[in-house]
Amino acid sequence: YYVKRADFVACHNQSYVRQYDMVQEVKPGGTFLLNTGWTAEGLDTNLPGAMKRYIARNGIRLFTIDAVEIAHRVGLGSHINTVLQAAFFKISGLMPVEQALDYMKDAARKSYARKGDAVVASNVAAIEEGAQKCVEVAVPASWANAELDACASDEGLPAVVTNILRPVNAQKGDELPVSAFAGYEDGVIDMGLTAYEKRGIAVKTPTWKADACIQCNRCAFVCPHAAIRPYLVSEEEAAAAPAGFETAVLKGGKNLPEGMRFTIQVSQFDCTSCG
């Protein structure tokens, strides 16, 4: 079973604050760490009203760290786990922080010694930065009475999305009554529900370079979430497209459709930044 009353909760992706109840299981007086690039003003603008209320009314200590920026700067790419682990030991007080960091550095040296000094140095730097760059945010008193956000409209949505998909995706599936599954006793579920699951969790997305593309479509083939897709557009569609919409002359040999141009489009709401 998952922990339901925690002293420490960390959110490693800032988009999750609007998808899940990230602080509801933090004990009063507990600690919440958010990995984000938002400033204090950005937190006030972007955090849901219910989250701000819970933090203020329950005396939750709020910390932030931009682990994505740190990992990229020290050479770890998208690997933020080491940065956030160091931040955890700095904030939690579970053990003397210097001792914890020394253990982490020793483990990094043993784990990555075969990969070279540069990799070891990057991990050691990530550990040090993770402990140094986590910042406690002064929670404004006004958050205790923060305005609650309007609920998303269910108008026009299929019943399966409203009654099953949304609660399950919000990790509230255990709260669904048996009656919610009436009509689905045989396990068959509606198709095409991906259209209603736009998570928007990517911290960075790929950019198509039209002048370097050989139009092999391999990028679209290997993308596990089908976020990268090739299209053919007519000259008229290309001319009417928004600014920044890139296309290229169609390649590929004989029998090509006339008057069509090639483009690769990336869905930022489906991408997971796996690259």
Question: PLM features: residue spans?
Answer:
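Ferredoxin-type iron-sulfur electron-transfer modules and their immediate structural context
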Residues: L101, A113-C274
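Active-site cofactor/cluster-binding pocket
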Residues: Y1-A170, A238-A243
